[in-house]
């Protein structure tokens, strides 16, 4: 999928944001992939360590993913500037580290010619599976409409839960939305972890909500012009951009970018 075409006004807003932030358009697109890998990493953490892992930065990062998942739509996201959706670079720190780790690991040849990191196997597997599922989901108009409709419903319900996107009822709704869309497709994404967590309903809901946020990040990445082959042929450029983004993260005040209300 080539970069989706948007209105001149929307593109101008992106150009202005990029100029003011010092981030390039390629780096802006990469942040969507970072969000996908963050969702994959948090899915792994939830499945192996339970909801207790959602403290401090992990909780903040999870929150940012969930909020953004409600603002990424079939035709056009609320913003083409990634940090307008995800808040700030600190909110994506887990994804920055996860994607960089996957890219620098030794690679093995596979039939698909895609890299297979040894150490980051599960996180990488989840990310690749979500990329595949996203394309299938958004090829089905009924699924795309289901997501759009439920996003609006959840946004309304958040008013009754003090805009707490991690409220159990909201997580359950996002989990159901994932099941009703990506969960209906094959091959299904199987999550591996400890039985005590994978049999716990609140943890299951959090995992599925996290997977939905990853599905949405994958869609956002494609909207911005991302594709799987960039992971193979653009690896060096990605690493350079990730390290530049890390420098920007340390230089910028954490509160400089805030999600739109």
What are these regions (language model features)?
Residues 2-98:
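Leu/Val/Ala/Ile-rich N-terminal alpha-helices, chiefly Sec-type signal peptides and the beginnings
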Residues 48-55, 193, 226-233:
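Structured alpha-helical bundle/scaffold domains in large eukaryotic membrane-trafficking regulators
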């Amino acid at each position: 999928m080539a970069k989706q075409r948007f209105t001149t006004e929307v593109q101008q807003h992106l150009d202005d944001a990029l100029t003011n932030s010092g981030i390039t358009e390629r780096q802006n697109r990469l942040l969507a992939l970072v969000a996908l890998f963050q969702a994959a990493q948090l899915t792994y953490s939830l499945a192996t360590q339970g909801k207790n892992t959602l403290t401090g930065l992990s909780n903040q990062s999870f929150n940012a993913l969930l909020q953004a998942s409600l603002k990424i739509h079939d035709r056009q996201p609320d913003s083409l500037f990634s940090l307008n959706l995800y808040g700030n670079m600190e909110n994506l720190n887990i994804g920055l580290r996860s994607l960089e780790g996957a890219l620098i690991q030794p690679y093995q040849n596979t039939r698909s010619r895609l890299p297979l990191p040894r150490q980051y196997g599960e996180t990488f597997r989840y990310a690749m599976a979500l990329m595949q599922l996203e394309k299938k989901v958004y090829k089905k108009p009924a699924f795309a409409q289901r997501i759009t409709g439920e996003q609006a419903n959840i946004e309304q319900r958040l008013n009754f839960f003090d805009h707490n996107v991690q409220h159990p009822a909201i997580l359950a709704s996002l989990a159901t939305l994932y099941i009703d869309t990506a969960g209906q497709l094959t091959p299904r994404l199987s999550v591996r972890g400890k039985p005590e967590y994978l049999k716990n309903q609140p943890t299951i809901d959090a995992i599925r909500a996290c997977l939905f946020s990853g599905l949405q990040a994958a869609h956002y990445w494609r909207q911005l012009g991302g594709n799987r082959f960039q992971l193979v042929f653009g690896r060096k450029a990605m690493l350079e951009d990730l390290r530049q983004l890390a420098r920007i993260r340390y230089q910028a005040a954490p509160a400089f970018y805030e999600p739109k209300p």
